[in-house]
Amino acid sequence: MKKTFVKILSKSYVEGYPVGFFIGLIILAIFGSMVCIFSFMHYSEEENSNIQMDLERSSKQIIHNIQMNAMYLLSSIDTLKALYYVNPNFDRNDFNVFLNTTLKNSEFQYLFWIKKINNNDRNCFEEKFSKEIKDTFQIYSFDENTNSIHVAKNKSSYFPILHAFPDINKDIIGLDINSTDYMNETIKKSIFNKKPTVHLNKKVLLSKRNIDILIVSPIIVTKTLESTNETMEDMSHISSGLFLMEKNVQASRIEVENGNDFTIFLSTTNGEIVYQENYLNFKTLYQVHESGLFEDRLKYESSLKIADCVLKLWIFTTEEYENNSKTYLPLLVSIISAVILVLLITYSVDQRKQKSLIAKIMREKNNLINKILPLEVSVKLENGEDVVAERSNNACVFFLDIAGFTRFSSIHSPEQVIQVLIKIFNSMDLLCAKHGIEKIKTIGDAYMATCGIFPKCDDIRHNTYKMLGFAMDVLEFIPKEMSFHLGLQVRVGIHCGPVISGVISGYAKPHFDVWGDTVNVASRMESTGIAGQIHVSDRVYQLGKEDFNFSERCDIIHVKGKGRMKTWYLMGKKSSDFSLKKDFSRSRVQPSLFNRKQSHVHCIYPEFPSGLQALNIENNLNNTDAGCENCSKILKKTYAYSPDHSTSNYYYHGDDNSPPPPSLNSNDLIDGSEYHDDPFPSDSNVGYHDTSKDIKEDENEQNETLLFNQEQLKKKQIENIQRDLSLNDSIEAIKILNNNNNNNINDNNINNTNLNNNNNDININNSDNVNNYENNNNFSDKIENNDGDNNNINDNNYKSTNENNIKSKTLFKDSKSLINDIKMAKENCDNNDDNNNNNNNNNNNNNNDENVESKKNK
C-alpha cells in the first residue's frame, strides 16, 4: 500500500512536475490562505484595539471635563458661603457683583442663596424683601402630586430661594426647597455630613429624560449639635448650586477629538439614567443592554463623582466612527504576509532539499567510513583529529579460514563463489555486532577480527571471553550451511596479547589494520588447526579455562619465530549446551574431511535443501555426473543408506573401498569404543555398490589427479622461489626443492600402493563380507610389518607435505636473478618423477603377487 501511494505521488502527468508537486502546491495554497486570514483577523483585532484605546482616552477626557465643571460649581458654593461670612447682610447687588467676578462657566451652572424663615417672621420678611427687590415676593411650595407651584402653607419654617445667579425664571425666586419630603432628607443629610450633598429624586429621574443635579451646602450657626432636629433649627442659610448635566456633557465632549462620535449614558449606581442622547428614551441601563442597539459597538465603562454622588458612565462608539477609524492595513498586511510566506516556504523547501542532499551524502560518507574504520577512529576523523597508531596490551585476535574453499571455487562460477562468501561474511558481521567484536579485514576466504584494541577495553580476560563466545557462535551457526550443503568447514585461531593498531592512509583508500606478534601467532593458530575446530594458544587457555571447556590434552606445534608452543582446542562454554567435543573426537579418529585421502562424507537433513539451492544460489553446473548435487565434491562412487527403503537421506562418496562408518551424524561421538569389527550391524539397511568395474578407471583418474597436483605444486614452488629466494641461498633452495619433490613423489607412490591394496580388498570382500573384512585388516598389518618405510611415510604423508611447504617458505629470501637455477631444478624434478614412476610400477606388481599368495594361504 505504501509503495503504491509513493508510486502515485511520483507519477508525472506534466513533464517535470509529479503529482506530489501539485499536491504540495494545493497544501501550500491552503496554508497561505490560512496565514492571510489569520493576518487579516490579527490586524483587524489590532485596529479594534486601537479604536478601543481611542475610546478610552476620549472617555477619560470627557469624564475629566465633567468632574472639573462639578468642582467649579462646588468651589462657587463655598465662595458664596465665604461671602456670607464676610457680609451676612449682603443684598442682590452685592450677590451679583461678587459672582460675576468669581464664577466660571456660569452658562453650565446656577447658584442659589437660600435663607431660613420662621413662620412668625414670614409676613414681615415678605414685605421687607419685596421693597428690596422692588417686586412682589411670596414664598411658594412645590406639589409633587400635581407637579405645580402654589403659595406655601403655614409651617414652622421655610427655605425660600432669595438670590439666583445668573438670572433665570422669576418663578424660582421664593420657592421653598424644603417643600418635599425627599428634599428634606437631602438637607438633613447635608447637615449631618457637614459637606455639600447632591439631591436626586428617583421619581423625578424616572419621569424626565435628562435632569439637572442640585447640590446643597448648609450654613450652621452653632458648632455643637446633639441631634439632626436641633441642627435644622439652628441652620440659618443654605448655599446651593444647580449642575446642568446636559450642557456640561455637551461642553465636555466638544473639547475632545471625535467626541460627538460617541454615545454617552450617565446613571446612578442603581441604574437609573441621569443623562442620555436626545434621540434615546431609556429609563435604566438594563433597557439599554436588552435593546441590542449597541451589541456590535465598542464600549467603555467607568464612573465619575460629583460631590458625594457617584455616577456610572457608559460610552459607545458609533458605526460611522468605527468605519472611519479602520484602514486597509489588515488586508495589505495579509497579502504581504501571504507573498512573504510563499517565498519563504519556497526558499525553505529549496534549502531543505539541498540540506537533505548534503545530509544524505554525509550519512553515506559516514556509513562508508564506519564500515571501513572502527567507530572510535571514524569519530576522530570526523572531529578533525589526527589518528595516530595506538598500542593495546589487552587485545584478542581472531582468524578464520574456510577449508576446502579452493576446491569449491575451482568447480563453481565466480558469481556463485562471491555469493557464498557474501552470505558467510554477512553472518559473521552480524555476529561481530552482537558480541562487540571489531572486524578488521577479509583476505580471500579468510576473516580477521579483534577486540580490546581501544583504551576503554583494558580487561584482557573480558576481551578473551568475548572473543571465545564469538568464536563459538561462529562454529554454531555458520557451519550448518557450509558443511552440510557445500562441503566446507572453517578453521579458527585465537590468540591474545599486545598489538599496534592504526590507519594506513596515503592519498587514497585509508585502511585500518593491526600488527604485532599476537597477530602472527593467531594466524599460526588458524593455519595449524583442525577444520571445524577452534585452535587457541596456551595464554587464551589460561585466561578462559574457568568458564570454557577445552581439549583434555594440549598439542605441541612449531610456530615460525616462536619455536614449539603449547596449544589447545576450545570445546565450548560451560554454561552452554553447544559443544564441539563430539566433532573434535571424530576428527581425532578420522582424517580430516578435506584430506585428499579421506572419503567425502556428508548427511542430508530434511530441514536443509540440497546443495547451492539451500543458500539461494543458482547452480550453473548442468552435468549432474560431474559432482555431488549436494556439495562441491566431484566423485563417482556412492554408498546409499536408506532406512525407509524409499528416499536416500545419507550419501557417501569415497576414493577407497572402505565402507562408511556406522554413524556420520555430527552429534554422535565416534571414538575407539564405538568401532566394531563389523561396521554395519546385521539389521542395518546398507546396500553396497559393486565398484569392481570401476577400479581401473579410478586408478587412471587418481594418477591423472596426482600428476596434476605435482605440476601445480612445482609451479607454486617455482613462483615462491622466484619471489623469495635470494642469490646467496639459491643452491640450498634448489636442493630443498628437489627434496620436496622427491617426498611428494614418494607420497604419490604410497597412495598408488594403498589404492591397489584397497582394490584387492574389494575383490576379497565380494566373496565373503565379514571374514574378508577381518582378513583385510590382518593383511594390512602384514604389509605394514613387511614394509615399515612405506608405512611411516603413509602415516605422515599429509603432515610431511605441509611441513615441507612451510620449510620451503621459511628458508627462502627475496631474489630477482634465479632463472637458470629454476630451470635446473625443474629438470631434476622431471628426472626424479620418471624414476619414481618406474619404482611405482614395480612396487605395484610386487604387491599384487603378494596379495595372490596371501589369498591362497587363507
Swiss-Prot record:
Residue intervals of the CHASE domain: 86-317
Reported regulation of activity: Insensitive to guanine nucleotides.
Membrane topology (Cytoplasmic): 1-18
Alphabetical UniProt keywords: ATP-binding, cAMP biosynthesis, Germination, Lyase, Magnesium, Membrane, Metal-binding, Nucleotide-binding, Signal-anchor, Transmembrane, Transmembrane helix
EC number: 4.6.1.1
Group of enzyme by EC: lyase
PROSITE patterns: CHASE, GUANYLATE_CYCLASE_1, GUANYLATE_CYCLASE_2
A GO biological process held by the record: response to osmotic stress
Keyword Magnesium: yes
Membrane topology: Single-pass type II membrane protein
Cellular component terms (Gene Ontology): plasma membrane
Domain annotation Guanylate cyclase: ranges: 396-526
SUPFAM superfamilies in the record: Nucleotide cyclase (SSF55073)
Residues annotated for Mg(2+) 1 binding in this entry: D401, D445
Positions with a binding annotation for Mg(2+) 2: D401, I402, D445
Protein name in the entry: Adenylate cyclase, germination specific
Biological source species: Dictyostelium discoideum
Gene responsible for this protein: acgA
